[in-house]
């Protein structure tokens, strides 16, 4: 069944790619207009492909260097195979291919949309949205196909039965992480490079053309016009395609990694192998199958994006786009319900931090997926509210434009900042809700379900720049005003859908980062992030700072490139006679060259910052500090992404409103007015916000967490080495009392011995360990069949530790409690009293509660291990019965913070 199931997403991805090909050929068959229109379109296509070719040549060198580094890691880390290298290279190639497909269809669809707009708006919508559909299905189809084929290869190679299933699956998924790392690495440079290109051209064209010369947008007299239209493709098409390709892959990968831990937790909780109809890997392959189903749901959704109204308004176009989107979401939700019922057992087990392994009904996983799908829809609604034409926030910016550029910018900044409120509350509720339902696996499935309709989301998003280009071609070709009016309707909706698409990308980055973070914590074996450690807190602050510095670097790059563009456009207006009169021909090629060179040069430093910083943090500060750094980048990055995306989108639509004519204080205000010029300035500031630094935050977040995940085996092996050293220290004849990094006492466990219990079970423990003391008591309690000792003294559990100030037990404590459960199973007459104790630090009442919670946590854990509840009592004593009366040193206080048990016989 596993083999058949794994080929289902392959088949679904192939269907998606075939439908993509059909749509691409349909677009190419449409009328491309007159010779002048085709010439302009050809210039845009040549400029776009020239940039991509130059960018890919640079990235080829990066891929070679990164591949060699990954190969070196595979030689020194046991769980990392050399197969991570071909996976990385293929991920990079597929990411580049996804962007290339989008570029090809966008530069073919733009002029055909213009020609269709000469006939009717519905036909123009059909052509532009079909172009977007090609982009969406190309990204989704390649992502699912690549992931599934590599997983089939790696699972067959690594899962051979020599180790436990989950251990062997770790090898397969670690190699598969290379595919995701390759995709995100290329996406970073495509997003940053494309963003710098497009905004250098856009800002330069607007500042000199609109503000100084007073000529319309996309006027053929503007030397930067072609570069501006090329930029729409390299930034909003190729860049967005690579971005969502990376998100798609990373989300599914994170869910697969956490699915493997669901299998491991099931085995730990039940002591038996995980059995299902999919060779015991249902939780791992479920996310891929959901992704495949999302492709088909998206195809169905595309058929609903139609309108018959020749005079359709922006609201009408937005309505049919929303219909297609929500239809795809609902279809995915319904099919996901049946997939979960089919692929997961009715009950699964998961490790909840602070609570141990708990039983979870598999229907909860479905509820978590509904949360993810709802987030995808709701974030679109929130973004549309803050950036949509006619909505209150945009109208407020329009009103503030009447008093100048300064008040316009203040209003735009406030709109972006305020937009974080609802978005972050939505993310927080989604994370909390999905975690409560089904742990981190629930969070990952929520993200996977949301990303399942990526093909539809990207189709909606990519149609925007196609419509924008179509309007530019109409303007440069001197087509009738009615054609530009139709393309402006699509362009205005496209601005909102672009902002919505960026909001969707932010939501995916937030949920994906959390899922990757959970996988990282499990991979490294750390028990959480303790911010009371100076080193960890320092890394958290550095992580929070990185998105701010990254944004600054990108904004400076745009400013520098835009300055060159402004100077070049001014030079041409000054030196080439007749440009403004329409008799001279501007040198468009020079502006394209400036944008290309600036983008390629300026994208390297932000890229290096993103990749090198987490590597340095991990190697020099350790696993826990890298985890804190990842958390800092994620929280700060999400906030900055929302702020910049929505501020830029709102500024853009405020400017667009003036071009159509808008009423301010009872008076109509149009293009060319002082208020319009203020709005143009605001839009110019917002352009790099929404199209360069804002979207780059998503990849910064995901790539940081992916690098952490790839480094996790190295850092995890260091943690293991440290643990081994601690064990060696404990077995020395002379034991020096120490405390570990968490502040827990390291006890002398003595020499390792085998203890055979009456049940026949054998446990391997130290001869001075708690288990040895309990067994010694039980062995000596009877003499000649008579009970001579009814109760032991308190025995401290020497390897049961809790998070400081919490009732959350550290994961490495579970082994000792499992041994205690085994001993109690061997001695059915044995009962125990569990006591929780603390030191005197802090509030006494709180200490008493913590000690009680810890004692009850141990009791609950032992019950889950099969010990009957009536054989145990639990009580918290707080700061009482010190074993170290002075309570004046760290070691002394660590001894007093403990869990003791007292054996009772009757």
Model feature map: region roles:
Residues 1-729:
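Hydrophobic packing and interface segments
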Residues 50, 819-823, 861-862:
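A generic secondary-structure signal
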Residues 746, 808-812, 827, 835-906:
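Periplasmic OmpA-like peptidoglycan-binding domain that tethers envelope proteins to the cell wall
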Residues 483, 696, 807, 840-841:
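Short strand->helix junction
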Residues 725-831, 905-906:
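Periplasmic peptidoglycan-binding/tethering modules of Gram-negative envelope proteins
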Residues 107, 799-801, 836-840:
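Short, histidine-centered active-site or binding-site loop motifs used for metal coordination
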Residues 40, 565, 813-816, 854, ...:
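Hydrophobic alpha-helical membrane-association signature
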Residues 46, 461, 740-742, 759, ...:
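Acidic/polar residues in short coil/turn loops that connect beta-strands
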């Amino acid at each position: 069944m596993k083999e058949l199931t794994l080929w289902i997403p392959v088949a679904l991805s192939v269907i998606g790619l075939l439908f993509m090909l059909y749509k691409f050929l349909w677009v190419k068959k449409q009328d491309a207009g007159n010779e002048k229109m085709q010439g302009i379109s050809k210039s845009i296509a040549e400029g776009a492909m020239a940039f991509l070719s130059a960018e890919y040549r640079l990235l080829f060198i990066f891929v070679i260097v990164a591949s060699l580094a990954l190969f070196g890691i595979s030689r020194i880390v046991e769980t990392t195979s050399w197969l991570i290298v071909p996976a990385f290279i293929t991920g990079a190639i597929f990411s580049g291919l996804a962007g290339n497909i989008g570029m090809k269809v966008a530069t073919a669809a733009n002029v055909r949309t213009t020609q269709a707009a000469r006939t009717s708006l519905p036909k123009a919508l059909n052509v532009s949205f079909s172009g977007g559909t090609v982009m969406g299905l190309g990204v989704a189809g390649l992502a699912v196909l690549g992931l599934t084929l590599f997983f089939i290869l790696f699972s067959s190679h690594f899962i051979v039965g020599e180790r436990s299933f989950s251990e062997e699956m770790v090898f397969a998924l670690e190699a598969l992480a290379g595919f995701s790392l390759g995709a995100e690495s290329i996406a970073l440079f495509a997003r940053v490079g494309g963003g710098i290109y497009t905004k250098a051209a856009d800002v330069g064209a607007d500042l000199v053309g609109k503000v100084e010369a007073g000529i319309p947008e996309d006027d053929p007299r503007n030397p930067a016009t072609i570069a501006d239209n090329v930029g729409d493709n390299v930034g909003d098409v190729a860049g967005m395609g690579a971005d969502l390709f990376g998100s798609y892959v990373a989300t599914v990968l994170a869910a697969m990694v956490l699915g493997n831990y669901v299998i491991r937790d099931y085995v730990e909780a039940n002591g038996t192998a995980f059995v299902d109809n999919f060779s015991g890997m249902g939780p791992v392959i479920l996310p891929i199958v959901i992704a495949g189903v999302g492709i088909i749901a998206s195809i169905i959704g595309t058929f609903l994006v139609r309108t018959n109204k020749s005079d359709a308004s922006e609201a009408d176009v937005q309505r049919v786009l929303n219909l297609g989107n929500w239809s795809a979401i609902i279809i995915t939700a319904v099919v996901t319900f049946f997939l979960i019922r089919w692929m997961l057992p009715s009950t699964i087990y998961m490790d909840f931090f602070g609570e141990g392994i708990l039983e979870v009904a598999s229907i909860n996983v479905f509820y978590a997926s509904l949360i993810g799908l709802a987030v995808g829809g709701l974030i679109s609604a929130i973004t549309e509210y803050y950036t949509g034409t006619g909505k209150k926030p945009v109208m407020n910016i329009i009103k503030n434009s009447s008093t100048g550029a300064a008040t316009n910018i203040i209003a735009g900044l406030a709109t972006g900042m305020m937009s974080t409120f609802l978005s972050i509350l939505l993310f927080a509720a989604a994370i909390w809700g999905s975690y409560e339902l089904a742990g981190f696996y629930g969070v990952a499935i929520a993200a996977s379900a949301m990303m399942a309709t990526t093909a539809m989301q990207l189709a909606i998003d990519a149609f925007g720049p196609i419509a924008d280009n179509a309007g530019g071609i109409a303007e440069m070709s001197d087509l009738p005003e009615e054609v530009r009016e139709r393309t402006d309707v699509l362009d205005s909706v496209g601005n909102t859908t672009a902002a919505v698409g960026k909001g969707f990308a932010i939501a995916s980055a937030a949920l994906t980062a959390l899922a990757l973070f959970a996988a990282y914590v499990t991979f490294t074996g750390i028990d959480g992030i303790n911010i009371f450690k100076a080193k960890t807190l320092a890394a958290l602050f550095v992580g929070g700072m990185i998105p701010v510095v990254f944004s600054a670097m990108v904004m400076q790059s745009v400013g520098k490139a835009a300055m060159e563009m402004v100077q070049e456009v001014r030079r041409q207006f000054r030196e080439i006679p007749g440009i403004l009169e329409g008799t001279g021909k501007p040198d468009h090629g020079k502006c394209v060259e400036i944008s290309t060179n600036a983008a390629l040069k300026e994208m390297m430093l932000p890229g290096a910052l993103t990749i090198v910083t987490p590597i340095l943090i991990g190697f020099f500060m350790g696993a826990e500090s890298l985890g804190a750094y990842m958390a800092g980048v994620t929280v700060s990055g999400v906030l900055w992404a929302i702020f910049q995306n929505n501020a830029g989108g709102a500024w853009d639509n405020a400017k667009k409103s003036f071009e159509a004519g808008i009423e301010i204080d009872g008076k109509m205000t149009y293009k060319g007015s002082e208020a319009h010029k203020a709005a143009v300035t605001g839009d110019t500031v917002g352009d790099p916000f929404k199209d360069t630094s804002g979207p780059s935050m998503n990849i910064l977040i995901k790539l940081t967490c992916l690098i952490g995940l790839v480094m996790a085996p190295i850092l995890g092996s260091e943690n293991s080495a440290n643990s081994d050293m601690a064990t060696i220290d404990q077995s020395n004849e002379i034991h020096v009392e120490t405390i570990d990094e968490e502040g827990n006492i390291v006890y002398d466990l003595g020499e390792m011995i085998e203890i055979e219990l009456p049940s026949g079970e054998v446990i391997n423990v130290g001869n001075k360990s708690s288990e040895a003391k309990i067994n010694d008591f039980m062995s000596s309690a009877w003499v000649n069949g008579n009970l001579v000792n009814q109760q032991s003294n308190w025995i401290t559990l020497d390897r049961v530790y809790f998070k400081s100030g919490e009732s959350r037990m550290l994961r490495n404590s579970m082994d000792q409690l499992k041994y205690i459960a085994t001993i109690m199973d061997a001695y059915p007459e044995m009962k125990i009293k569990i006591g929780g104790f603390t030191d005197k630090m802090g509030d006494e009442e709180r200490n008493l509660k913590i000690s009680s919670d810890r004692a009850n946590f141990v009791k609950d854990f032992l019950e889950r291990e099969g010990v009957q509840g009536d054989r145990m009592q639990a009580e918290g004593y707080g700061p009482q019965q010190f074993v170290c009366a002075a309570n004046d040193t760290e070691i002394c206080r660590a001894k007093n913070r403990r869990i003791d048990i007292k054996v009772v016989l009757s």
